[in-house]
């Protein structure tokens, strides 16, 4: 399959897109950043924020999958994709750097904060060794890591 990935509203590395890329590459699929001049079997569009504009141009693909909190707070990656090591090669980042979450969720119920609605109460998610997988540095993307004994102990 020919797969396109599209980060609609984020300049930061998108962990979900990196995991989707890893999943498809492991299956032997061709994965690249979406190019409007190319035709794809499937394009994954990721949108982080609800208040940012959507990609309002034609997407040349047989199938389009939109995901991320900006589109649907209830949609999540399938577990077999979510637990994969991300494909860091799609971004120009340090080869010793990893991204991930030790915990998911949030203990607070702020009206404006989507995380408790999307992920529930704070809970352990991954071990640091799962995140780094031999890399020397990690950027932890947790929303409230110090609110968890698990996150605090790591």
What do the predicted segments below correspond to?
Residues 36-40, 54-61, 71-79, 130-134:
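Short loop/helix-cap segments at secondary-structure boundaries that form the rim of catalytic
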Residues 46-47, 65-71, 142-143:
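Glycine-rich beta-strand-to-loop/alpha-helix junction loops that act as flexible
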Residues 59-119:
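Catalytic core of nucleotide-activated saccharide and alditol-phosphate transferases
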Residues 1, 40-42, 52, 98-104, ...:
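Conserved Radical SAM active-site core
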Residues 5-8, 88-90, 94, 128, ...:
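Short, flexible coil/linker segments at or flanking structured domains
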Residues 1-63, 147:
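A short, structured N-terminal alpha-helical element that caps or precedes a catalytic domain
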């Amino acid at each position: 399959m020919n797969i396109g990935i599209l980060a609609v509203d984020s300049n930061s590395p998108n962990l979900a897109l990196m995991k989707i890329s890893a999943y498809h590459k492991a299956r032997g699929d061709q994965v690249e950043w979406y190019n409007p001049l190319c035709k794809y079997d499937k394009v994954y569009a990721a949108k982080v924020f609800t208040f940012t504009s959507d990609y309002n141009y034609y997407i040349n693909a047989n199938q389009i999958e939109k995901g991320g909190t900006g589109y649907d707070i209830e949609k999540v990656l399938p577990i077999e994709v979510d637990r994969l090591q991300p494909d860091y090669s799609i971004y120009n980042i340090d080869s010793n750097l990893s991204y991930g979450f030790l915990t998911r969720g949030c203990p607070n119920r702020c009206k404006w904060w989507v995380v408790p609605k999307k992920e529930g109460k704070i809970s352990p998610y991954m071990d640091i060794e799962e995140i780094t997988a031999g890399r020397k540095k990690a950027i932890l993307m947790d929303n409230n890591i110090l609110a968890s004994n698990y996150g605090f102990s790591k």
